[in-house]
């Protein structure tokens, strides 16, 4: 028996987003005060992300008979991430050259006030590649969870799971406890997810109330170019990959529509991480692959952020009439491939990563970031949506590559004609 339409989550989220836009447009002062609703929802989700990743990865690895499989799955995932990320970067480069969203602005960099982006630049300068790698190692076991550092938690879970896999019967007792804990955590997620419409309303009302729909008008060409390129990437690039694996990308997008609407409302792909992991297990992906690929992808497979990075940098170059040679543009791609690894699923992280890229490519004025500061919040939604679809597809691909994809579940779930039971441990 189907739920009444007013009780369906994605319908509630859509209505909440529309109401949020209306409140932000007509009552901006009141709408800005709704910010705690969005922030509170994201904090509730982030509260359980670390423990869920830990439990999922530990039980997945502990259940693997061959520990070489962990390295194999991780290696395949990273290879896939780098290949697809390169496609995203190149597509952003090509689209900006073809559509030229920055041509005609003729802005003198000397007239730009860089104070507005000084804080982002400071954060960007504060971390090198070595710092990023060292940051993966937590100061203590507790600090990783306390600070919600996904990569640090993933490292702890990998070590924990590897030890449990070789600990015999004693290890099985601990694994059983952690598996039981995951039941509780996903139960908490189900409760929190019911609050998604409130969070989406608060975040959208704040965004429109603070920045206003009118702030979009001068930059509509850049926004349109970015959204169009992201759609092309999902439909064409990810569509071809999905077809090669044996599923339809549009049906996959429809399957995760609730998670995408949560992301749309909050502008944070992390807000839907627990639900995405649950949906992918229901889709037929093995729990061990989901546990390894999804958390890793949130730092290493940010397709939307990659498109945004090359497009934003070239837009600033076009707007300030800064000529770039092809060598400089190829260097830009290489630099972006590295700096984008530091972007997480948190709102605004992409802008900090952009500052890091411009800091390494001094030909383009860093003060040019001021041009897109006002609209970055509106582009954040598209970045997050593309990221979540990319990570979902990556998980299905790696599962199929490992021959751990249940095709019957996949086909039934995407058709929507069979009620899929929740996977074990959920």
Curated annotation (Swiss-Prot):
Q: Which residues form a coiled coil?
A: none
**Which Pfam families does the protein's record reference?**
SDF
Sorted alphabetically, which keywords does the UniProt record give? Cell inner membrane, Cell membrane, Membrane, Symport, Transmembrane, Transmembrane helix, Transport
Query: Chief subcellular site?
Result: membrane
Instruction: List the subcellular locations.
Output: Cell inner membrane
NCBIfam families linked to this entry: PRK01663.1, PRK13027.1
Function comment? Responsible for the transport of dicarboxylates such as succinate, fumarate, and malate from the periplasm across the membrane.
Name of the protein: C4-dicarboxylate transport protein
């Amino acid at each position: 028996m189907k739920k009444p339409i007013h009780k369906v989550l994605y319908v509630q989220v859509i209505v909440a987003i529309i109401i949020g836009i209306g409140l932000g447009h007509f009552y901006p002062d009141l709408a800005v005060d709704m910010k705690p609703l969005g922030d509170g929802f994201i904090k509730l989700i982030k509260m359980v992300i670390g423990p869920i990743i830990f439990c999922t990865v530990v039980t997945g690895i502990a259940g693997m008979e061959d520990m070489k499989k962990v390295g194999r799955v991780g290696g395949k995932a990273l290879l896939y991430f780098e290949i697809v990320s390169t496609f995203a970067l190149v597509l952003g480069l090509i689209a900006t050259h073809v559509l030229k969203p920055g041509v005609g602005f003729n802005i003198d960099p000397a007239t730009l006030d860089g104070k507005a982006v000084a804080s982002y630049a400071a954060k960007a300068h504060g971390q090198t590649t070595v710092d990023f790698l060292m940051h993966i190692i937590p100061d203590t076991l507790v600090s990783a969870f306390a600070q919600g550092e996904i990569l640090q938690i993933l490292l702890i879970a990998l070590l924990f799971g590897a030890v449990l896999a070789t600990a015999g019967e004693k290890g099985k007792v601990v694994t059983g406890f952690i598996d039981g804990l995951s039941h509780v955590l996903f139960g908490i997620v189900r409760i929190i997810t019911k609050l998604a419409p409130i969070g989406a309303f608060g975040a959208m009302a704040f965004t429109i109330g603070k920045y206003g729909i009118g702030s979009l008008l001068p930059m509509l060409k850049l926004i349109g170019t970015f959204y169009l390129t992201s759609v092309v990437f999902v439909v064409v690039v990810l569509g071809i990959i999905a077809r090669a694996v044996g599923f339809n990308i549009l049906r996959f997008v429809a399957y995760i529509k609730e998670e995408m609407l949560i992301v749309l409302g909050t502008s944070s792909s992390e807000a839907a991480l627990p639900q995405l992991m649950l949906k992918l297990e229901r889709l037929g992906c093995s729990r061990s692959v989901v546990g390894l690929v999804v958390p890793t992808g949130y730092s290493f497979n940010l397709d939307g952020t990659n498109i945004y990075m090359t497009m934003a940098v070239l837009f600033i170059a076009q707007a300030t009439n800064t000529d770039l040679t092809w060598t400089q543009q190829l260097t830009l791609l290489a630099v972006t491939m590295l700096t984008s690894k530091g972007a997480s699923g948190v709102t605004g992280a992409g802008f900090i990563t952009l500052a890091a890229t411009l800091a390494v490519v001094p030909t383009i004025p860093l003060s040019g970031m001021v041009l897109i500061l006002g609209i970055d919040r509106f582009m954040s939604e598209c970045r997050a949506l593309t990221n979540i679809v990319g990570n979902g597809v990556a998980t299905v691909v790696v599962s199929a590559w490992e021959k751990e994809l249940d095709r019957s579940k996949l086909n039934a779930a995407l058709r929507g004609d069979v009620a899929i039971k929740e996977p074990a441990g959920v």
